[in-house]
Amino acid sequence: MSRAIRNIAIIAHVDHGKTTLVDKLLQQSGTFAAHQHIAERVMDSNDLEKERGITILAKNCAVQYEGTHINIVDTPGHADFGGEVERVLSMVDSVLLLVDAVEGPMPQTRFVTKKALALGLKPIVVINKIDRPGARPDFVINATFDLFDKLGATDEQLDFPVVYASALNGYAMLDPKEKSENMRPLFDAILKHVPARAGDPDGPLQLQISSLDYSSFVGKIGIGRITRGRIKPGQDVLVLDGDKPPKKARVNQVLGFVGLERVQMDVAEAGDIVLINGIEEVGVGVTIADINQPEALPMLTVDEPTLTMNFQVNTSPFAGQEGKFVTSRQIRERLDRELRSNVAMRVEDTDDTDVFLVSGRGELHLTILLETMRREGYELAVGKPRVVIKEINGEKCEPIEMLTVDVEEVHQGAVMQALGERRGELQDMQSDGRGRVRLDYRIPARGLIGFQSDFMTMTRGTGLKSSVFDEYAPIRSEATSRRNGVLISAEQGEAVAYALWKLQDRGRMFVSPGDRLYMGMVIGIHSRDNDLVVNPIKGKQLTNVRSSGTDEAVTLVPPIQLTLESAIEFIDDDELVEITPKCIRIRKRFLLEHERKRASKAAA
């Protein structure tokens, strides 16, 4: 007897409450014992996810409700991890679209909804954070309907059920005026509106792998949904991978999800979401098929990367002093390991054996990888991010992003001017009547490189911005480059307070007294547009002659604290970010001044 199954994904914009909602569904379905302590955002298991409050990897879990097994997939909201979202949607029969009751649909909501509607999925719309002051559910429902209509939804998809919820407080209702204590209305809506499992359990096996995991114990793990047939441990199967010849393989283990645990299954059948291991050839999009009647499913497509960066061996004078893994072989092995599960990423070799070209879906996608490597003890240098240029019909084209910014009205002018300089085109402008404005732009992706820090300064930390890839379009005129030059250290040694104090009039510093510096290292932002070589390790000249002047009190302005994102956004083409487990430094590509002059002449 087949068990009743529902497969759903939760999709939403960043910070609209996906992971918190999953927490409450797990708790209220009785998946955890009553006495068990549950961490907040239990699905965000990665350290970086917990710190930043974002979901990076799509996760699977399952709950039991009234005899039905509900598989839930929690997806990332950032477009940089959209490669995850697209594949996950191929495993499910419906989606819960979470929309903030105040903000309404946002760019990533648009990105993921477009993918879901194109696959023919019928969403259940959940208006979350209904308890927030300023909640406007009717406006949000109308905006969601308009969004569906713009994205070409069918009449059936436009007739979507709506559930009102507060994931944080753990309740849901079908009418915002009702009172509710729990999530039952949402569970009931899932059972009512999500189609039951489809597929013939007695037909020949078809299982498409839509995401990968890796275990040092069993090797590659494929995660996917069984479209047809049954699978059990020890079964012989064929691996069908596009045009490649079919390969025979044997399944080692079949695992299913119960709560957050992975549980071994004796047999799984059509409609189940399972993990299988023991097959070395497993990859995203491949079909695991019956050995006697193999039939391949169409390959899954993942959007191509839009941003590329050079990862290279650290060649600074401090190379190898702070990291555990420093050689090109170790960096390449780590990147290869990342490729096993990070499907939207590409790694290519270059003419220089110490430099690798790494491409991803955005700045966040690549900086998360760099931060992970840094914490694992890797030491490396990276260059300025560049957009991936494609040639379409003989014309060079660049990626264009849909950008939404939400700012206070007093900052609107400065933000619009900055986006205009970066070749942005204003598409829409809406005021919420409470002193904030939402601006929608189409802007070249390279115009957004380095915009985050400027934007936060302009809006005094109150602005919200998010962008999502829209299309490739012919290259427009050049975007503006960085306005300020940099201050470059002329010597190697430790920074001296007196020298930094004397240099304060020249610009803002990145370094503090006592920091180790080397020749060619960038120590601050120059107040003018040219680079300036300075000596930050020069002490005060002391003599044995009694001076009539008293000692001057040295008061230093606190330095700018470099984070990985801010450093990568800041650098120019002739600079590198040196990343070690202990430090993030900015340096010139050529450390010696005469080499820099020679390189700039050659470039001219």
Protein language model regions, located:
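P-loop NTPase switch module centered on the Walker A-proximal segment
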Residues: 1-99, 103, 143, 212-215
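Acidic, low-complexity intrinsically disordered tails
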Residues: 1, 583-585, 591-604
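A short, contiguous, amphipathic alpha-helix enriched in charged residues
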Residues: 316-340, 557
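Interdomain boundary/hinge elements
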Residues: 38-40, 151-163, 197-208, 243-257, ...
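Conserved structured catalytic cores and adjacent interaction surfaces
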Residues: 3-20, 79, 105-114, 120-124, ...
